[in-house]
């Protein structure tokens, strides 16, 4: 998966989607946000009772699906400078770049997301 988008739009989507994420769950994928890059970028949070999906305008260069821990992903994006965020993943290893900042985090298999 590879895409780029504005930091402010991504941060707002993460904040909205995180409202439906379980802070502690027996299913680890429920502590994360499902990212789906296709014709657009979709972020989904779900806690077995409530689900929230947001769509972010993004330049999708490579389609894919991945789950990232909501808290860590949100903290990273919040601390990025106001610029274009570039996101690239391969085999669940995610690289997030924005300005002079760069982070590498591990995602999880989207098949585990309900």
Question: Model-flagged regions — what are they?
Answer:
Residues 1-114:
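Structural preference for solvent-exposed beta-strand-turn elements
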């Amino acid at each position: 998966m590879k895409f780029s988008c504005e930091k402010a739009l991504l941060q707002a989507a993460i904040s909205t989607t995180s409202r439906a994420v379980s802070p502690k769950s027996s299913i680890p994928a429920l502590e994360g946000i499902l990212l789906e890059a296709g014709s657009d970028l979709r972020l989904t949070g779900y806690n077995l009772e409530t689900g929230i999906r947001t769509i972010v305008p993004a330049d999708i260069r490579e389609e894919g699906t991945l789950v990232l821990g909501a808290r860590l992903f949100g903290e990273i994006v919040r601390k990025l400078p106001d610029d274009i965020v570039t996101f690239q993943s391969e085999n669940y290893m995610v690289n997030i770049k924005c300005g002079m900042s760069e982070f590498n985090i591990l995602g999880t298999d989207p098949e585990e997301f309900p």
